[in-house]
Amino acid sequence: MAESNFIHDFIDEDLAAGRASTVHTRFPPEPNGYLHIGHCKALVIDFGTALKYGGLCNLRMDDTNPAKEDTEFVDAIKEDIHWLGFDWGDRFYYGSDYFEKTYELAEELIRNGDAYVCELTPDQFREYRGDLTHPAVSPYRDRPKEESMDLFHRMRDGEFPEGKYTLRAKIDLASGNFNMRDPVLYRIRYIEHHRQGTKWCVFPMYDFAHPIQDALEGITFSLCSLEYEDHRPLYNWVIEHCSVPSKPRQIEFARLNITNTVLSKRYLRNLVETGIVDGWDDPRMPTLCGLRRRGYTPESILDFIGRVGVSKANSLVDIGLLEHCVREDLNAKAPRRIAVLNPVKVIVDNYPEDKTEYFDVTNNPNDPDAGTRKVPFTKELWIDADDFAEVPPPKFFRLKPGGEVRLMSSYIVKCGEIVKNEDGTVKEIHVTADLETGTGTPTDRKIKGTIHWLSAKYAADARAILYDRLFTEANMNDLPEGKTYGDYLNPESAVVMEKAKVEPSLANAAPGEKFQFVRIGYFSKDTKNPGVFNRVVSLKDSYKPQ
């Protein structure tokens, strides 16, 4: 957020003109689900803008809609924000804290003739809404103020069923902006609120509550996504017609859309509830808790958001950019370790049965201070099945009958006898080591292939899960007619390697600790299941930054 953008330009103009003296923003998530990468853009813009100008950013739970809101989500949202490195200080609020004041301001609108109680049913409301050439209609628009006030009080007292009455703003039934055609401000709902319990049975609509909450908190710049641009006139109307202590300015920016991903809370909830994924923190989910469990770092996510930038135009961002950012971050700081995901046994025929020697292996070639570690070498080894081909394709430089390869950081070996199981699969491969090559390749021999390995005696057992994109279709926001996201689920989004082998030290890796498995990819120790390593991202990067 260090770079300037059009939001900063607007703020600079207001500060210079004296329309604002401070920069005070807010991040108002609805606590009915977990934050995802899309929310992260808004979060970074809100907190980042305040940081840029030395201002403040409030955290406000937008819990005016009681349906599906839960303290579980409140706690998770706080954890995610702190994980990304932001803090709201002592400025944590709930939208429901303002219910009483919001109700009083609704009464003020009624007294001033700016609101009325309407008893159109939802079907009638749609029928009388009009179109671009015909104004909306409400036979209750001229209801006396005293009658509207009495009905509004009785609505709060619980005298009427849901849908019987609403409170509507009196603005302009002929407006070309349908949001201004006497929008509903309050509706009756008999549902328990996660904080207020059953105290309230009338709840304010978002378009009414939100500007009031901003104004009561002294917010100067209300930054929100582009779908609220058409709601801005209503936002301003509420501020102008209610006795509130400040006049915030709403500024809209484009939402974040990413390829091969759905960011709709409804769809994400469905993925969880139908068991397609294993909870909100499934490592394939775009939720921040899912990305964190998979192994994404805060730095990589913030780098991604920074590269995407802030614009007014909606666009579809290649998920490859997000993968590129975490790959760059982990390449710089993740220690290297050896893992054999699909092991096949190798026996070094000319190596002593009872001997163990240790080879020095670099921890991170990008960080000289990371030093080296000792990796044990014994007669029996594990190599990856992909590094052997009995009938090799052209330009196959790994292990093959009669061929030579270097075992990484150790000896050159030559392939000899191949022993098979009854079903024809390879049971073990016998090799002969050139024991004079432990410290480097002789100058008279060219060895094109180097493969990784582990001692069969010392390697630890593990499970590795190769996570990939959850959906095969790039633009999940524009599916062909008749298709749903379920038609594009990637059957290989989580490939489990049940019999993986890893360096012995990895048996004691801390949950969430990250490594580069050499020649494979970047992995993170799972935070829930012992002995499981989640692939964060593959080693190779086909994405080309613009």
Predicted feature descriptions by range:
Residues 28-32, 60-68, 90-100, 123-124, ...:
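Conserved short loop/turn motifs at secondary-structure junctions
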Residues 73-99, 105-106, 113-115:
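A glycine-rich helix N-cap at a beta->alpha junction
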Residues 246-325:
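Long, charged, mostly alpha-helical binding arms that flank functional sites
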Residues 3-12, 16-79, 193-225:
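N-terminal catalytic cores of NTP/NDP-binding nucleotidyl/phosphoryl-transfer enzymes
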Residues 59, 63-65, 108-268, 326, ...:
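Active-site cores that bind ATP or allylic diphosphates and position pyrophosphate for catalysis
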Residues 228-232, 236-238, 302, 306-308, ...:
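Core subunits and conserved enzymes of cellular information-processing
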Residues 69-83, 108-111, 293, 297, ...:
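Charge-rich, well-structured scaffold segments of protease-associated domains
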